[in-house]
């Protein structure tokens, strides 16, 4: 059996720039920057005191109100990463106009949502309860409220999606792997529709302390948070933590056409590789990233000359240079026609949600023919012919976009999206 | 309604997110108030915490209604 074609027919997002795909995208294109000092908990003793939080509010004007997405009594039982996923999945399914009611449609629709670290804070609190009050005080919801695959589980229960129910945990590559793997399930005929993406709610003391301990976070811009996430810039010193969820509705092409669904883009390529080098640092020669992108292009039946836009992993760490080197090796003489930006400069690093949110931004870059900007790129530490889209978005033709995600453990994922022209 | 009954009722309302008028003495947590088996475990924990009593598992299994809970706690505190 040949591989079936897969398209994106719906998107949903809770990002630091807004609740909703369009709210986030319009602010991203306008140069919005979500970084701010953390005020919700004590940060005085933490090396990194800033983050890109989602805009909490009453739900109007692109703000996020958890009560809009889950009843308060249910929220109490789960970590916020699950609520973010429920919100983004509700939005994505509504956007796609897909509401499976028949037995056949329900079993043909699956869910594959991942998270990098899941309910870390809740696990810590559970540990305190066990230590201070004993095992009889541990909530029956402690486990099901923290498990990473419970985002997929909860979404499937709410929408009665009875196809494949799966999850991914590959650190910062999670969201891209989820979309890639879910596309494969459709391509191979295991499902016709998949609700896929990533979710993360990592902004808490233990996570900020832990990521700072492994020297991953920016700590030199605490007094000027909006300047902290600066991919490729000489003054970058680590990533800024973000939070949120990105969910896409993936659909078999003929299934989407038969019901007249809106099509954002086709998922034409997916590559995966391992660095086999170091637990947190990428391989210095960028070979893992290179092979990952190359595999995705090969699967897509495209060459580097076909790429218009790259949504870089670009975390604002030393690794930015390694990724750029791998991209330059991949694209060769085509470098001067490619735009590549890191949207982490605006929304921070959403860890397990990053790859999914950035895949959606890549699809929208194709839809609107516009490359979102790399903020704070005042003084590039690199010389390249690739357009890094400094400061402001660039209108340009974009038919093919590549989205990169690389994670701790040396896990790499690349997605290639292409404009769908009806053929 | 006794003080214990009022406090039990408040816990049930808070945990199950139900309207106060539904929480009658004979209301079954599962059949009338929408609880599942994990909700009832959590309710029993909340009663233990609020009233400083220990409710053993076999006793918890027989606490099916608001009235059952009130009776158990009154007896335990007597």
From Swiss-Prot, chain B:
InterPro entries: ACP, ACP-like_sf, PP-bd_ACP, Ppantetheine_attach_site. The modification O-(pantetheine 4'-phosphoryl)serine is found at residue 37. SUPFAM superfamilies: ACP-like (SSF47336). GO terms for biological process: lipid A biosynthetic process. It comes from the Bacteria. Pfam families: PP-binding. Its main location: cytoplasm. GO terms for cellular component: cytosol; membrane. The keyword Ligase does not apply. The keyword Phosphoprotein applies. Keywords: Cytoplasm, Fatty acid biosynthesis, Fatty acid metabolism, Lipid biosynthesis, Lipid metabolism, Phosphopantetheine, Phosphoprotein. GO terms for molecular function: acyl binding; acyl carrier activity. It is found in: Cytoplasm. 4'-phosphopantetheine is transferred from CoA to a specific serine of apo-ACP by AcpS. This modification is essential for activity because fatty acids are bound in thioester linkage to the sulfhydryl of the prosthetic group. NCBIfam families: acyl_carrier, PRK00982.1-2, PRK00982.1-3, PRK00982.1-4, PRK00982.1-5. HAMAP family: Acyl_carrier (MF_01217). Belongs to the acyl carrier protein (ACP) family. Carrier of the growing fatty acid chain in fatty acid biosynthesis. This is Acyl carrier protein AcpP. It comes from Rhizobium meliloti (strain 1021). The lineage of its organism: Bacteria, Pseudomonadati, Pseudomonadota, Alphaproteobacteria, Hyphomicrobiales. The gene is acpP.
